[in-house]
Structure formats: C-alpha cells, structure tokens
C-alpha cells in the first residue's frame, strides 16, 4: 500500500485541497479530500491524472529529425513517407525494442501514462513473417513493461498500396498481411500482452487506402469488442483519391459503410466537410488528433471548434513521435485553432474559463474512450496513473488550480513534470525516469547503426 498526499489535486468532481490518495495493487483504493497529511504520507503540491497518447508509431521515434532536408520536388507527406519506409526496412526486432523503450520512457517523463500503439511494422526485412508472427508486437510489449507505461496494442491491418485493392509497394512489404495472417497476428498480440499489467488490445485497419471494404468487414470482429482505430482524411490527396474510387470522402465513406461508434477512433480526420464533422461527432467516435505530427507533415488543421461544438470527443496522440510532450501537443492544438480562426482561446469552454483545463479534460476523457478505459482519473478503482508538477518552475509560480494547467501547457512545457506514478509505481522522480540512462544508451546504439 502507498499513501500520497497532495496540497491540491484535480479529481473528477473538480479541484480539491489536502487530498490523500491510497494506492493498492496498482489501483487507487481511496481518495479523501480535506485531510491533513498523516505520518508516512508522501506529500506533493499539485496532482493531475496521467493522460494517454492515443496514437503512436513507436519505431518512427528513431528517425525524428532525419527528414528535414528538402528534396528536388515539392516536399510533402508522401515524400516523407518514402524516407520513413527506408528507415523501417532497416530495423531489427532489437532496434524496435530499443527505440520503443526510450520513447515510452520519454512519454512518462512528459505525463503520458498510457499509449495506443498503432503497430504496423510486423514482418522480417524481406516481408516474410517471423517464425512467431507476433515477434514485433512482443517487442512493443517488452518496451511497455520495461518503462511501466500502460499499453493499448493496436495491431494494424495493411494489405494494399492505395484505394480499390491496389497492389502494395515493395517498400511496404514489412507491413502487409492477408486476413488470415492478421487473425494470427491479433492472436499472437493478445498473448504478448496477456501478463502485462493494465494492457489491452484493439485493432487498427490502417486506412481506406490499405484495406478493401470486404477486408474491413472481415477484420472488425477480431477486435472482440475492443477499440478500432483507422487513419482517415489526413491528406488532401487521400480525399481526392477516395472520391475518385468511391465518389465519397474518407470520413463520409466510413460513416456510411462501417459500424462507427464509441469504440472507434478516427485518426486525424483533418480534411472534412461541415456535414462530416457533425455526423462524426454524433457517432461518439473519438477524433485522434496529433497536432505536432500534423504540423510536421504539413497535413492541415482539424475543425476542432466545430467538432467540439457538435458534441464531439477528441484525444491527443504523438503519432510520428518527432517531439513528445503532453503540453506540446495541447499547445499546438490550440495554437493551430488560433491561426485558423485568427482568435485567442478558441477551445476554452466559455467566457472566463481556462483554455488549458478544457484541453486537458478533453484529452483525458477522449483518450480514455479511444483506448477503452472504463475508469480514469484520480478516483477509486482507476489505475493509479498520477502526475505531479514542479511548482518551483517560474511559469507555475503563484498559480493555483486551472492556472497551473495553463502555465504548464502554454509556458512551462516539458520542464514542469516532477513525478509520475504508473500503475502505482513511481517511475519518474524529479522529471527523470529511472530507466532513462540505460534506455538512451540502447537507443543511441541502435540509431547510430541504422543511420550509418
């Protein structure tokens, strides 16, 4: 049993002072506000629930910053994708484990306590399945176990190079599965996370480019009631190609032909009409927004104000993992809306309300829904995922309650996280994960070889 005491903590009911939290077997057993610290309590100033990065491609952390040279032609998502394919083709299972471990350490240091790993690097370099088809999934699970982050594993089905069942490109060979192979992969992935505390599983049809309607219908039952994530309408070209194939836009097609509901998460959904935004919001599906990656790749800006106004739910993901941070993603999301609408505090819940708090609340609830977490936050029964902030940071000085969140997101950024408990285990202290040094050494050794 662990007893923590916080001068101020954000509970599901709102802020409370002098809060004692009792942790048993990795879960929150008791939350008692309005009490003085007892002998043996570990005391901290500000406590928040940990957030989820609902969308991650862990292996891409290894190539962060390596695609910033302009090519001969217009540089776009599609030219970046070619660089990503080349990097993916070189990686071994040991490389994937090393890169994912450091990534998850970094996520925890930034206040992410769960990750939705949209995992599509499945096979050996020649495209043939490993003897254990779940080899790469097992390496992701090992990385999660080593770091302490909670894992929602989302094995991705990827069969085609474009709409209408087009043949895949040679550089996509490590991703490609038949429906039968994917069923075996999902089964192996379940085994990989079976003993992992806090882990669960869903599926991720990669995109309408990569899966036919018949294949989509065939694989959805493999989710077995778990989350279903899919990339949708990230790029203008994707929308144009979908229109040429079907006469419909990607989100429009999904809403009319797939059983999209609260289990689903549409990643990006950047290029949508007003009608799509409203219909999407009504399904209860989550918009998986990855503002830093969307900016990095030149994708565009999601219609967040309109989506939230229609009652939509969103969470945040780190996607390409070019930069990892709770505050960074939420700040980029709000600043993108400010640039789009030429206004300030666009995603605030109303006059006199904190923008940072609104962003945080959406990310907490939307991330939990997208990753099938029934109980989340500082409440009895929830996994004990807790983040404390360093109130000595100059950007948090003199702040209280919602103003602390504003100071963290819009000013202090990545430097403000102090301690993190993941499943009741204190994995970060003084802003530093206990595995940071060894994880960095393994990562550096892998990446030096990969880029040589």
Feature map (PLM): residue ranges:
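N-terminal metal-binding scaffold of metallo-dependent hydrolase/deaminase domains
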Residues: 1-37, 46-47
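Histidine-centered catalytic micro-motifs
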Residues: 49-61, 227-236
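Active-site gating loops and adjacent loop-to-helix segments of metal-dependent hydrolytic enzymes
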Residues: 62-97, 124-133, 160-180, 236-261, ...
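Alpha-helical scaffold segments that flank or form the walls of functional sites
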Residues: 65-150, 180-196, 444-452
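Metal-coordinating catalytic core of metallo-dependent amide/deamination hydrolases
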Residues: 123-269
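Histidine/acidic-residue-rich catalytic or RNA/ligand-binding cores of hydrolases
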Residues: 236-248, 276-281, 298-307, 322-341, ...
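His/Asp/Glu-enriched, well-ordered alpha-helical/loop segment
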Residues: 256-259, 263, 305-393
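C-terminal cap of metal-dependent C-N hydrolases
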Residues: 383-440
């Amino acid at each position: 049993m662990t007893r923590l005491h916080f001068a101020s903590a954000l509970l599901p009911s709102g802020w409370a002072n002098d809060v004692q939290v009792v942790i048993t077997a990795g879960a929150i057993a008791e939350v008692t506000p309005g009490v003085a610290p007892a002998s043996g309590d570990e005391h901290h100033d500000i406590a928040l629930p940990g957030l989820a990065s609902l969308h991650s491609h862990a292996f891409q952390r290894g190539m962060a910053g390596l695609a910033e040279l302009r090519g001969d032609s217009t540089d776009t998502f599609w030219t970046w994708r070619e660089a990503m394919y080349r990097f993916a083709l070189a990686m071994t299972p040991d490389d994937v484990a090393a890169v994912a471990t450091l990534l998850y350490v970094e996520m925890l240091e930034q206040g992410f306590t769960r990750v939705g790993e949209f995992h599509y690097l499945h096979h050996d370099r020649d495209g043939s399945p490993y003897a254990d088809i779940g080899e790469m999934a097992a390496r992701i699970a090992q990385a999660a176990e080593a770091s302490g982050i909670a894992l929602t594993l989302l094995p991705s089905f990827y069969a085609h190079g474009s709409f209408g069942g087009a043949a895949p490109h040679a550089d996509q060979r490590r991703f490609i599965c038949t429906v039968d192979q994917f069923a075996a992969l999902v089964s192996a992935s379940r085994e990989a996370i079976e003993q992992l505390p806090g882990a669960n599983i869903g599926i991720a049809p990669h995109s309408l480019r990569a899966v036919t309607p018949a294949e989509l219908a065939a694989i959805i039952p493999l989710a077995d009631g778990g989350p279903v994530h899919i990339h949708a309408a990230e790029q203008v070209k994707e929308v144009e190609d979908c229109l040429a194939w079907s006469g419909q836009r990607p989100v429009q097609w999904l809403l009319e032909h797939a059983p999209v509901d609260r289990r689903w998460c549409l990643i990006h959904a950047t290029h949508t009409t007003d009608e799509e935004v409203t219909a999407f919001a009504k399904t209860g599906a989550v918009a998986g927004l990855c503002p830093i990656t969307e900016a990095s790749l030149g994708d565009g800006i999601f219609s967040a104000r309109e989506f939230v106004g229609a009652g939509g739910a969103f969470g945040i993901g780190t996607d390409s993992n070019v930069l990892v941070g709770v505050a960074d993603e939420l700040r980029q999301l709000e600043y993108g809306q400010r640039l789009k609408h030429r206004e300030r505090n666009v995603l605030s819940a109303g006059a006199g309300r904190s923008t940072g708090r609104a962003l945080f609340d959406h990310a907490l609830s939307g991330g939990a829904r997208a990753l099938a977490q029934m109980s989340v936050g500082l409440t009895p029964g929830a996994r004990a995922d807790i983040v404390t902030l360093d109130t000595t940071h100059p950007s948090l000085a003199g702040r209280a309650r919602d103003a602390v969140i504003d100071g963290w997101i819009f000013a202090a950024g990545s430097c403000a996280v102090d301690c993190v408990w993941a499943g009741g285990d204190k994995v970060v202290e003084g802003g530093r994960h206990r595995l940071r040094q060894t994880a960095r050494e393994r990562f550096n050794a892998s990446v030096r070889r990969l880029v040589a």
